[in-house]
Amino acid sequence: MADPKGSTSKDGLDDWCIVEAECSDIENDLEELFDRDTDSDISELLDDNDDLDQGNSRELFHQQESKESEEHLQKLKRKYLSPQAIAQLSPRLESITLSPQQKSKRRLFAEQDSGLELTLTNEAEDVSSEVEVPALDSQPVAEAQIGTVDIHYTELLRASNNKAILMAKFKEAFGVGFNDLTRQFKSYKTCCNHWVLSVYAVHDDLLESSKKLLQQHCDYVWIRGIAAMSLFLLCFKVGKNRGTVHKLMTSMLNVHEKQILSEPPKLRNVAAALFWYKGAMGSGTFTYGPYPDWMAHQTIVGHQSTEANAFDMSVMVQWAFDNNYLDEADIAYQYAKLAPEDSNAVAWLAHNNQARFVRECASMVRFYKKGQMKEMSMSEWIHTRITEVEGEGHWSTIAKFLRYQQVNFIMFLAALKDMLHSVPKRNCILIYGPPNTGKSAFTMSLIRVLRGRVLSFVNSKSQFWLQPMSECKIALIDDVTDPCWLYMDTYLRNGLDGHYVSLDCKHKAPIQTKFPALLLTSNINVHNEITYRYLHSRIKGFEFPNPFPMKADNTPEFELTDQSWKSFFTRLWNQLELSDQEDEGDNGESQRPFQCSARSANEHL
């Protein structure tokens, strides 16, 4: 029979090896084991109470979420904010503080914590001494690949004052302030031919295309781009306001209006002119067209305006005399417009006594014109006036109108001849008739072409109301009424006779003069008034009984223009017995124009 499986006890092995476990009564007694659990070191590990407290789980969840959010925030700060922002801005600024800095004290006892809260606290204390300022130019690597245009838009969106940001970047790029090159226009409707524009974040392709497109709008173009800023100096062919310029540039460069700074340039600043002049010589600057006059005046040696010319009053008087400017406002405005072309006008604008020069110039021109008029005969005066009339007309218009008013043309021509030659008691013509018959239109057209004067009886209370009669060759008193007829019958009989009278003029003693040729219009036929019988022989009257005819389009049937009177005097020159101009010039005198300006010693004759 075989041996049973398993281990067999052999001699000598049971002395040192425990083959079987010894049984204990205590371990087998489970009840006794549970009874002794109160004496254990881990007592109250299990709560046998049946009542369980829920606890504030929502507050615990909120605390955990707050910790996670704070961790994410600290990671972002360490990633995007530069701790050396102040040192990068200025090393000296970092050392300047408003309050004394205190060194952190060492802790006497090390804090015991799980690690997270204590670490965050220490990091906050270490960074609190430096101010974290986000740099506008700092961008993450991933965002920098999007494009510089998007970065520039982001900078403008982050800025609270767009204009200040643009001006700061302009000065950083070009080294000068934008206001140092420009003068301010507050209104968007003020027009100017010259504009300076600083445009931010323009695409390179659009900037290159604008160099060609602007040539059709401007006489001079100056363009330069540095970094994100582009500077334009545009001299437009016609004046434009700021709104029009912005509309043109936004459509051409595909930019927003907030990206544009626009002001007119300083035209009288040498430093600003030198900036544009020297900048045009740089390799990075595009220019088109000749230099503007205001730039050339201040930069180019030998230019006419660079010479320090003193103001010459005689040149201004000669200019006003040649252009027939007698009014002070016309002289001041027109001479100021002449400044870009005349150095004497520039000197006048730079003078402190502009108003005094204008008054004196107007007075001198009136003196010269009055002296010239007195020297001329009536024939020479008429010839001079009709020579200045441009265009051609036909004298038959006047003849037809007189025939329409049932006026004998031969008798009117004879009366006009006597009036122009100042025949005694034939020196005045009266046109009378009902209202709206063309009396004033007829006489006013003659006064206009012969440069006569109009007197108004409304000023008769002044003793100087007849003063214009001493400054003209022909005068008109329109719409004479009974008070005016009474005044003429009382005071003006000698004047209507063609004799010398004493005429009181303002700011001077009474002068001895004769009345010029006088035209009157009235609704009263003075020849039918017995009260004014002493005026009958002194006035030649013609009646206009018919209403003035008008066309369907409300235009006059008879056009009494300067050209019509020019043709009238030219055609009837001999019938009016006006002297020939060639006969008046046979005395051998030179027919040179009047010269009232001072000549230089070396000027050619």
Curated annotation (Swiss-Prot):
Annotated GO biological process: DNA replication
Gene Ontology cellular-component terms listed: host cell nucleus
InterPro entries associated with the record: Helicase_SF3_DNA-vir, P-loop_NTPase, PPV_DNA_helicase_E1_C, PPV_DNA_helicase_E1_N, PPV_E1_DBD, PPV_E1_DBD_sf, Rep_E1_papillomaV, Znf_lg_T-Ag_D1_dom_sf
Region ranges (DNA-binding region): 145-308
UniProt: ATP binding residues: G433, P434, P435, N436, T437, G438, K439, S440
Motif Nuclear localization signal, residue numbers: 77-79
Catalytic activity of the protein: Couples ATP hydrolysis with the unwinding of duplex DNA by translocating in the 3'-5' direction; ATP + H2O = ADP + phosphate + H(+)
Region span, Disordered: 580-605
Principal subcellular localization: host cell
Post-translational modifications reported in the UniProt record: Phosphorylated.
Biased composition (Polar residues): 588-605
One of the Pfam families matching this protein, by short name: PPV_E1_N
Keywords: ATP-binding, DNA replication, DNA-binding, Early protein, Helicase, Host nucleus, Hydrolase, Isomerase, Isopeptide bond, Nucleotide-binding, Phosphoprotein, Ubl conjugation
Subcellular location: Host nucleus
EC code: 5.6.2.4
Family: Belongs to the papillomaviridae E1 protein family.
Stated role: ATP-dependent DNA 3'-5' helicase required for initiation of viral DNA replication. It forms a complex with the viral E2 protein. The E1-E2 complex binds to the replication origin which contains binding sites for both proteins. During the initial step, a dimer of E1 interacts with a dimer of protein E2 leading to a complex that binds the viral origin of replication with high specificity. Then, a second dimer of E1 displaces the E2 dimer in an ATP-dependent manner to form the E1 tetramer.
HAMAP family per record: PPV_E1 (MF_04000)
Subunit record text: Can form hexamers. Interacts with E2 protein; this interaction increases E1 DNA binding specificity. Interacts with host DNA polymerase subunit POLA2. Interacts with host single stranded DNA-binding protein RPA1. Interacts with host TOP1; this interaction stimulates the enzymatic activity of TOP1.
Identification of the protein by name: Replication protein E1
Species this protein is from: Human papillomavirus 14
